[in-house]
Amino acid sequence: MDSEEIPTFSSPKEETAYWKELSLKYKQSFQEAREELAEFQEGSRELEAELEAQLVQAEQRNRDLQADNQRLKYEVETLKEKLEHQYAQSYKQVSLLEDDLSQTRAIKDQLHKYVRELEQANDDLERAKRATIVSLEDFEQRLNQAIERNAFLESELDDKESLLVSVQRLKDEARDLRQELAVRERQQEVTRKSAPSSPTLDCEKMDSAVQASLSLPATPVGKGSENSFPSPKAIPNGFGTSPLTPSARISALNIVGDLLRKVGALESKLAACRNFAKDQASRKSYISGNANSSMMSSNGTKYPHPGHTSFFDKGAVNGFDQGTPGLGASRPSSAPGMLPLSV
């Protein structure tokens, strides 16, 4: 109203009409505002009642939620205490189980170690048993061979007596043959001076053949075995009527040399046999004592590893091949026509 300008009136009627119209206008506006206010008040009362009802519901819900919150807090505290108690018990149980596991592992390692030691000891005992069995079998075999060899040497001792007689006779015949050969050589020297050149050459060839035959070491095995024991008719004594041929003289000398070598070989073998019999008796007594001690020590729990090699492996059996005098590297070679004597 202040902003509206009051018009100028020409007459009082116009001014009265203007103010009447304006009052009616304001009155209508007042009526409309009153109606709106009544409607607003009614709506606000309804809204207030509704809000109060909602507030009551909200307060009730809030109280319920607070009660639930308190209950949940109590449950949380209870569960927390239970969890801590359960965690402490679980920690103690885990600690006990870890201790039991460590002890069980230690016991398991000890048992594995003990099993390995038992297996190793069992293997060592089995190896010692096999070595002992093999050594005993080898010793029995060599003992049987030695017994057979002793029997064979005893038979050769019997043959030696007859051979000595034959050798002595052949020595006498060889001495006579050498004397006769010396006489023949002197006769050939005399005849060589008076004979022509061609007979001289023949005599020289004959002398060289005789000297070569005398320097021969031994006859072959076949010839030696065939002519080892000649009959008295094959070798005369040098004083008979029929002279010996050069080939007969050479074969007789070779037979004598072979017999002398055989006699020497038999003497060396007899000495070796005596030494072997002495060593065998000493070894037999030592082996029996060692076998009894090894059988008594086999009842123990363990064998040290170096002790598993028995006496038979080192000295008792190999002594036949290495340490026995007369039977090892210094064994004489067998004479032609005779069997070798070896264990």
Swiss-Prot record:
Phosphorylated in mitosis. Residues 184-204, 322-343 are annotated as: Disordered. GO terms for biological process: cell migration; centrosome localization; chromosome segregation; establishment of chromosome localization; establishment of mitotic spindle orientation; lysosome localization; microtubule nucleation; mitotic centrosome separation. It is found in: Cytoplasm, Cytoskeleton; Cytoplasm, Cytoskeleton, Microtubule organizing center, Centrosome; Cytoplasm, Cytoskeleton, Spindle. GO terms for molecular function: microtubule binding. It comes from the Eukaryota. One of its GO terms (cellular component) is microtubule. Residues 25-190 form a coiled coil. Its main location: cytoplasm. InterPro entries: NUDE, NUDE_dom. Pfam families: NUDE_C. Keywords: Coiled coil, Cytoplasm, Cytoskeleton, Microtubule, Phosphoprotein, Transport. Belongs to the nudE family. Required for organization of the cellular microtubule array and microtubule anchoring at the centrosome. Positively regulates the activity of the minus-end directed microtubule motor protein dynein. May enhance dynein-mediated microtubule sliding by targeting dynein to the microtubule plus end. Positively regulates lysosome peripheral distribution and ruffled border formation in osteoclasts. This is Nuclear distribution protein nudE-like 1. It comes from Gallus gallus.
